[in-house]
Amino acid sequence: MKIEEFNEKMNENLKELDIELSEKQLKQFYDYMNILIEWNKVMNLTNIIEPEEVIKKHFIDSLTVLKHIKEDDSIIDVGTGAGFPGIPIKIAYPKTKITLLDSLNKRIKFLDEVINKIELKDIKTIHGRAEEFAHNNNYRENYNIAIARAVASLNVL
C-alpha cells in the first residue's frame, strides 16, 4: 500500500474517533506497518498483515483508549506482543511515557527495531513476565495506567 492510500484510510478511521494526526505521525504508523509486515515473514508476530486490517484491527483499535488517558500519563503495556496498544498510543501521544513488557525476547528485538526506526522517545522495552514484574519494586506502582490487549482473561490480570 502506498503512503497516500494509507494516509487516506487512516484518516477515514481516525475521523470516527475524533483524532487528528500530523503527517509525521501518519508516516510513523506507515513505517511501523511496513516493519511489522516485513518481520512477520520470518517471525510470527500477528495473523493480521493485510494493510487495511492492520489499520483497523491494530492501529485504530489501539487508539480507542486515547479518550481515557492523558498525554502525560505513564503507561505500562503488559504482554505487548507486536506493540499493541503501546506503540500506537505513543505515536498519537508523543509525551506519554510508555513501557512495553513482553515475555519473548524475539518480540523485544522487533519492538526495539520499530522504536529505533520510527524514532520514538521516552519508550522502553522490558523482557520479562508480568507476574514477576508485579512484585518488582522498581516497577510496581510506577505507572498511572496498566494496559493489556489479548494477554489473559481479566481475572488473571
Model features per residue range: what roles?
Residues 95-99, 103-157:
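S-adenosylmethionine
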Residues 52, 70, 91-94, 156:
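Ubiquitous "structural anchor" signal
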Residues 1-2, 6-72, 76, 109, ...:
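Class I SAM-dependent transferase core
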Residues 82-95:
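Conserved SAM-binding loop of SAM-dependent methyltransferases across substrates and taxa
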Residues 78-80:
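Conserved beta-strand/loop positions that form the S-adenosyl-L-methionine
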